[in-house]
Amino acid sequence: MKLKEVTEGKVRIFVPDPTGYMVEGKFDPSWAPVFYNPKMTFNRDLSVIVVSILKPKIIVDALSATGIRGIRYYVESWKSEQLILNDKNPNATSLIQINAKNNGIENAKIYNKDANALLYEVKSDYIDIDPFGSPAPFILSSLNAATRNGIVAFTATDLSPLEGSSPTSCRRKYDAINHKLSSSKELGLRVLIGKIIREAAILEKTVYPLFSFYADYYYRLFVRVENGARKADDNINKHLKYFGECPRCGFQTFVEENCKTKCPVCGEIFSIIGPLYIGPLYSMEFLKRIMDLYSNFNYLTSFNRIQKLLNVIEKEARFKNVFYNISKLASKLKISAIPPIESILECLGDASRTHFAPTGIRTDKEYEEITKCIKSLR
């Protein structure tokens, strides 16, 4: 295997040299013998900050590839009592051994196993699931491996089913009815959380989001796992619903059931998706801890981007409603010239931008107030 050394954060690791695996002058990370995607540096950078707050005793990186994620956690976040790095690809585990040793990690436990098999053998207070594609095949096993109040982190790059572009795939992987709606960038994350909650309930556990975000072409989500059938039931009853959007006027709301429901504004039948999670996407207490700490990581190459994202999330996190996509809403209202987002925010008063979409606005104000502002500013 042809290798090259790269620096990410405070570690240096060997990865497959892209020049040795190009096809017609192009390269995709999946073509290399071991997967390494530099485009996920932002994901790993922000995760390093989160793990530094959590300070877990046992870190399990179940799909390690080069080992970059787990190694960075150990070097930059927190020297956990135990670091478990696993990949079913023997080329990957050989590379992990080299990379761990080169970064001064002598006590890492390195496994060459199927991730699900490993996760049914271990218990951990921090498990990271960062697959190539959907995390769905690893949800149940990772929740099973989580100790009481443990954390499981998920990355999902299969946005097509989650955002409703591939409804049949979403039904198959996430057991949810889905199709493209105006706020699908956020709704996809809620569909994912809904699936995780239902899987946890099988084990008489439940989960609550600590921190989550959308970036580039993926979702990243950190959930706290709690034990108890009653907690599982309560979370399902309180936070698993459906979402309806009016295809005519753009009114949107959470609804109890997947049945024909008329829009209260114009009488059109809602487009409905779900089940999905309707609760908060962030723990406000944990978000404050991130905001207090992240400046200590100003050496990160993506620090400015992290700062920008966190500043937006801090503002939008206090609102309960799904964001309104002003571009899509204006189109439904037959308004061709969209007013500046800042002007709409000023008109509404209690509102913010959202990191999910550049033309999105998050507010708990009523639909009528939002449309009134849009119409008055055109």
Swiss-Prot record:
Domain Trm1 methyltransferase residue range list: 4-374
Top-rank taxon, per record: Archaea
SUPFAM superfamilies in alphabetical order: S-adenosyl-L-methionine-dependent methyltransferases
Binding site for Zn(2+): 246, 249, 263, 266
Protein keywords: Metal-binding, Methyltransferase, RNA-binding, S-adenosyl-L-methionine, Transferase, tRNA processing, tRNA-binding, Zinc
GO molecular function, one term: tRNA binding
BP term (GO), one: tRNA N2-guanine methylation
Family: Belongs to the class I-like SAM-binding methyltransferase superfamily. Trm1 family.
Protein function: Dimethylates a single guanine residue at position 26 of a number of tRNAs using S-adenosyl-L-methionine as donor of the methyl groups.
Protein name: tRNA (guanine(26)-N(2))-dimethyltransferase
Organism of this sequence: Saccharolobus solfataricus (strain ATCC 35092 / DSM 1617 / JCM 11322 / P2)
Gene that this sequence comes from: trm1
